[in-house]
């Protein structure tokens, strides 16, 4: 971009005042910046609370209107939170809560490849003037963009103008989230209490989008799609809790309980095919050809029974132990129970030593197990339905063969750590080291071609992980009217694939061969998440090797690294006045 006078994209618009006019070929550093707008958020809230000797009630309502940073985008959010508790008798109380959120969104920019973000960051041109694009992308009834196919063909080579995407290829979605519970507490005897609680969490999403077609647009077939997604989680929890002081120095807390969980997920989508019968009338029933429909349903159930015992000695030493049974509907029904246990201990040594600067000090260690059940419908053959061929329905056989003998796996983890606080809690350190192994994991492996399937689900994979977690917090400034808190965290995680299946030492997790000749794989003996792909060939001196036709030579199946970060962390700063 040396400032040479050239014809820019808008100099090819017929009838435009700048038709045929040349301008300098120079960079415009603010071209992407000028597309975005200042976001504005308005929030209104109302709270109410009331209580007495035997009841309490609280309600909060909040409305938020958000004008987004991209043009023609808006998001409105409405929240309602209600909670209350009533003592029915001296020994019985009930409680309940409801949390609801409605979120309505218009024309938020999507993410991923093909989105505005991908356009700006990967394919954009720095000489473009965003103000000219906004004013001229729609001119005299036709659409124009910066990457026209040729001097005589104004259709985009790859991208419509960004403002066309925001004002003409519109989308909308509405999300509803509800969660609530109802429970009862009963004092059964001295130190013995009972609790029964039911919980429900539900999420619903509806979305609509249209693909507009006009003169010179990238799309040549108009379309419309809509979908709904419903997810719910229901849980029943019942437990007995016994607490007593065995001696003046030793206290006991014991819990036995039972949980029943149910998860449901339903996805329904529909889109037009072949265009629209009536132009600019965006409903699925206006499809020129038979519309495409898709529905997916997933139901899973889990049950658990557990017991926990905690012992505390002189507020110095604590020991906890638990044992539980878990049943999962996604495993073989004849072998779907997993037994696990957990033992932890902690010692508060700051109670025994007198260090003026030390406010609190604790060391801890523990061992825990947890179940890992397979995904839904891995034990039963399922078939997907497709678009009917005339009056004949169509169904597809899955590529992965179901395994009716599939069971759950187990995670075993050991953890050590300490927690220190100094100077009346003005400075703190929390450190943890963990070492875990996941065994008997359900994994999809390559199946023999003679089976008619490409993959098979089996229980065999073993992975091991270790890492550290460090959190540091402090209050550098503390006065009567001002408080400044700082916190930082740092963590590492190394996950290694130890075993997959006899005769199989790698599994392809994802593939982008069409774009980058790259696979995401797990390989025995390597850290999880290896990127495998082609790499330019080098000679013994590190020079790039070229073929006889002048093109670069490549070697396939080369390791480029893995997707796991060396470390993660963050810093939080909070000021209160």
Enumerate the predicted regions with their spans.
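A generic beta-sheet turn/junction motif
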Residues: 50-54, 63, 313, 422-424, ...
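Long intrinsically disordered, low-complexity, acidic S/T/P-rich regions
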Residues: 526-529, 533-535, 548, 554
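Residues embedded in well-ordered regular secondary structure
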Residues: 1-71, 109-112, 127, 136-171, ...
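Extracellular/periplasmic, surface-exposed regions of secreted and cell-surface proteins
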Residues: 83-92, 97-102, 153-211, 222-522, ...
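Short, conserved phosphate-binding/catalytic loop or strand-edge motifs used
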Residues: 212-217
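Solvent-exposed beta-strand/coil patches in large extracellular/periplasmic or lumenal scaffold regions
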Residues: 403, 534-536, 540-543
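N-terminal, post-signal-peptide soluble/periplasmic segments
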Residues: 1-23, 89-126, 130, 135, ...
């Amino acid at each position: 971009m040396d400032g040479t006078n050239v014809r820019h994209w808008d100099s090819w618009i017929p009838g435009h005042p700048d038709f045929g006019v040349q301008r300098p070929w120079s960079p415009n550093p603010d071209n992407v910046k000028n597309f975005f707008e200042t976001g504005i958020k308005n929030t209104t809230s109302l709270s109410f609370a009331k209580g007495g000797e035997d009841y309490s009630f609280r309600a909060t309502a909040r409305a938020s209107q958000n004008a987004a940073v991209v043009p023609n985008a808006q998001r409105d959010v409405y929240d309602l939170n209600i909670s209350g508790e009533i003592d029915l008798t001296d020994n019985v109380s009930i409680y309940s809560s409801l949390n609801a959120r409605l979120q309505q969104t218009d024309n938020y920019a999507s993410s991923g490849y093909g989105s505005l973000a991908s356009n700006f960051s990967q394919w954009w041109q720095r000489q473009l003037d965003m103000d000219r694009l906004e004013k001229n992308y729609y001119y005299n009834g036709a659409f124009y963009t910066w990457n026209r196919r040729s001097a005589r063909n104004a259709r985009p080579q790859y991208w419509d103008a960004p403002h066309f995407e925001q004002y003409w290829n519109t989308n909308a979605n509405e999300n509803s989230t509800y969660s609530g519970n109802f429970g009862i507490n009963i004092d059964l005897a001295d130190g013995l209490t009972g609790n029964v609680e039911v919980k429900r969490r539900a999420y619903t999403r509806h979305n609509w989008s249209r693909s507009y077609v006009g003169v010179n647009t990238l799309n040549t077939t108009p379309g419309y799609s809509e979908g709904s997604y419903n997810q719910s989680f229901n849980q029943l929890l019942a437990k007995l809790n016994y607490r007593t002081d065995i001696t003046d120095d030793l206290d006991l807390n014991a819990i036995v309980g039972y949980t029943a969980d149910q998860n449901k997920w339903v996805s329904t989508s529909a889109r037009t095919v072949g265009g629209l019968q009536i132009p600019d009338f965006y409903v699925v029933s206006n499809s020129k050809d038979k519309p495409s429909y898709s529905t997916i349903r997933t139901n899973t159930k889990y049950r658990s029974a557990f017991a926990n015992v905690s012992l505390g000695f002189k507020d110095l030493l604590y020991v906890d132990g638990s044992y539980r049974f878990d049943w999962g509907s996604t495993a073989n029904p004849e072998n779907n129970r997993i037994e696990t246990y957990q033992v932890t201990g902690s010692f508060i040594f700051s109670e025994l030593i007198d260090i003026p600067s030390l406010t609190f000090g604790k060391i801890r260690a523990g061992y825990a197990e947890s179940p890992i059940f397979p995904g839904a419908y891995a034990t039963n053959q399922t078939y997907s339905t497709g678009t009917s061929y005339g009056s004949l329905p169509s169904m597809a056989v899955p590529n992965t063969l179901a395994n009716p003998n599939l069971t759950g796996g187990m995670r075993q983890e050991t953890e050590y750590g300490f927690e220190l606080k100094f100077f009346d809690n003005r400075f703190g350190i929390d450190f943890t080291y963990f070492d875990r192994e996941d065994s008997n994991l359900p994994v999809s492996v390559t199946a023999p071609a003679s089976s008619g399937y490409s993959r098979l689900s089996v229980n065999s994979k073993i992975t091991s992980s270790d890492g550290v977690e460090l959190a540091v917090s402090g209050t550098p400034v503390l006065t009567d009217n001002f408080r400044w808190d700082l916190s930082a965290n740092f963590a590492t995680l190394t996950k290694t694939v130890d075993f997959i299946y006899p005769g199989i030492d790698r599994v392809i997790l994802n593939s982008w061969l069409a774009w980058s000749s790259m696979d995401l794989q797990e390989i025995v003996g390597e850290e999880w998440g290896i990127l495998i792909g082609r790499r330019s060939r080098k000679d013994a001196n590190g020079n790039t090797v070229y073929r006889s036709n002048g093109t670069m030579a490549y070697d396939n199946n080369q390791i480029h690294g893995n997707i796991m970060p060396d470390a993660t962390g963050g810093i939080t700063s909070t000021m209160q006045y």
